[in-house]
Design a protein with these regions (language model features):
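Hydrophobic helical h-region of N-terminal Sec-dependent signal peptides
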Residues: 8-12
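Bacterial N-terminal signal peptides that target proteins for export
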Residues: 1-7
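N-terminal signal peptide c-region/cleavage motif recognized by signal peptidases
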Residues: 14-16
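C-terminal and inter-domain tail/linker signature
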Residues: 19-163
Length: 163
């Protein structure tokens, strides 16, 4: 094998491939809620149900069942505290039917007092106009005494929501 052939072969294998596989949701969300540790299983269920009932279906009247009053919010679009949370999400519209599952849910991880839900996120492709690609979005919660005490996600500042 010539030096040129070796160099070309190495260059081929060293070149990054940009054909990422699409992110796909978990086929069995009930399995994601399981844990050998009862506390972790309870924390997963709390975060999952909060997401289904309060965030997705906007049953804001049930927020106190899941959240502490002094809830800490790290999303730059919503205020800290349950009152600020409700004020922000009330702008998105009224309650909707509560689904049995969360659309696009990929995984639920729990460790200590933290639970992370990750989701499929479809985005406009900036390189290929008119096309979409998938990536991952997440919401992380800190649980304190059986209620959500703190929240993080990957949100950036947005225009004020409207109904």
């Amino acid at each position: 094998m010539t030096r040129l052939h070796c160099a070309l072969s190495l260059a081929l294998f060293a070149t990054p491939v940009f054909a990422a596989l699409p992110v796909t949701p978990a086929p069995d969300q009930a399995a994601l809620l399981k844990s050998n540790d009862p506390k972790l299983a309870a924390n997963k269920k709390l975060a999952y149900d909060f997401f289904r009932v309060v965030l997705r279906a906007r049953h804001l009247d049930e927020a106190g069942k899941y959240m502490k009053d002094d809830y800490i919010q790290h999303n730059p679009n919503a205020d800290t505290g349950i009152v600020g949370f409700k004020a922000y999400f009330s702008k998105l519209g009224g309650p909707m039917p509560i689904a049995d599952t969360v659309p696009g849910l990929v995984a639920i991880q729990a460790e200590g007092n933290f639970v992370t839900l990750s989701f499929v996120r479809e985005m406009d492709d900036p390189v290929n106009k008119g096309q979409k690609y998938t990536t991952t979005w997440f919401d992380m919660f800190r649980i304190d005494n059986g209620k959500i005490a703190e929240h993080w996600d990957v949100a950036t500042k947005a225009a004020s929501p409207s109904k």
